[in-house]
């Protein structure tokens, strides 16, 4: 990977990891355009995921610190932490699906699946315009539902994680700010756990990897990830999550026509 490719991939990952437009699909399309072998470039993608997780931790540093204190000492934050862990535990479904249907693992690199996933999540995002919401904190049922939505996004390339989880939260009655906040909290263990799972599953050698571009990709993803978080929080707070629907549908259709 060159430094130019590292900057490009970091930019794509940083902007699209949190905006509900599927970072994996955008990376897949970008890597196809750059002529890179996506199955051989595990570590650059892992670096960008770590960069975006760092962006969440920095953006919500006060919230994470407060949750840590309340979880240890007791308080309302302990319940939130347990609900995040409950939602994250749903990811065992992904492992079970991969074991039961090994062919599903190849969906990650399939442009057709990414195109269909994008169009599907686009329709879902459009539907959130009519979701009724009000409560500020997720229930156990809502946490499980958002966790299962995260599973679907992990299995079906193109199905945005943030779009699926935030949208599900809205349909289960959360107000936009609470849905987005809980989705970001869920993203930290999910993304880190997913990266570790991919590394162990792929068993890619690290000794021949050029660390310079990898580190650069992670830093770029961190910077643009912060900007994307702020943009999404602003739009979701205004009830405009559905704005991303037409873009996902259009990009999915274009990818199907030109890349399939």
Predicted regions and their residues:
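Multi-pass membrane proteins that catalyze or facilitate reactions on polyprenyl-/lipid-phosphate substrates
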Residues: 1-260
């Amino acid at each position: 990977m060159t430094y130019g490719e590292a900057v490009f991939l970091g930019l794509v990952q940083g902007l699209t990891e949190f905006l509900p437009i599927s970072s994996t699909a955008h990376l897949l399309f970008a890597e196809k355009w750059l002529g890179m072998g996506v199955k051989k470039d595990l570590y650059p993608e892992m670096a960008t995921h770590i960069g975006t997780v760092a962006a969440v931790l920095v953006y919500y540093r006060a919230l994470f610190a407060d949750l840590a204190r309340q979880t240890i000492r007791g308080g309302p934050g302990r319940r939130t932490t347990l609900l995040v862990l409950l939602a994250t535990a749903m990811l065992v479904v992904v492992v079970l699906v991969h074991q039961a249907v090994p062919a599903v693992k190849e969906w990650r690199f399939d442009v057709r699946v990414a195109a269909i996933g994008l169009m599907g999540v686009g329709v879902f995002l459009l539907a959130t315009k009519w979701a009724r919401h009000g409560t500020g904190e997720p229930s156990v049922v809502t946490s499980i539902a958002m966790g299962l939505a995260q599973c679907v996004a992990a299995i079906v390339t193109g199905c945005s994680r943030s779009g699926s989880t935030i949208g599900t939260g809205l349909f289960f009655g959360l107000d936009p700010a609470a849905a987005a906040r809980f989705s970001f909290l869920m993203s930290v263990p999910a993304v880190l756990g997913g990266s570790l799972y991919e590394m162990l599953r792929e068993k890619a050698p690290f000794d021949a990897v050029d660390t310079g571009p990898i580190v650069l990709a992670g830093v770029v993803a961190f910077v643009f990830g912060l900007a994307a978080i702020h943009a999404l929080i602003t739009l979701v707070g205004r009830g405009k999550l559905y704005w991303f629907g037409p873009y996902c549908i259009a990009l999915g259709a274009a990818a199907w026509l030109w890349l399939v």
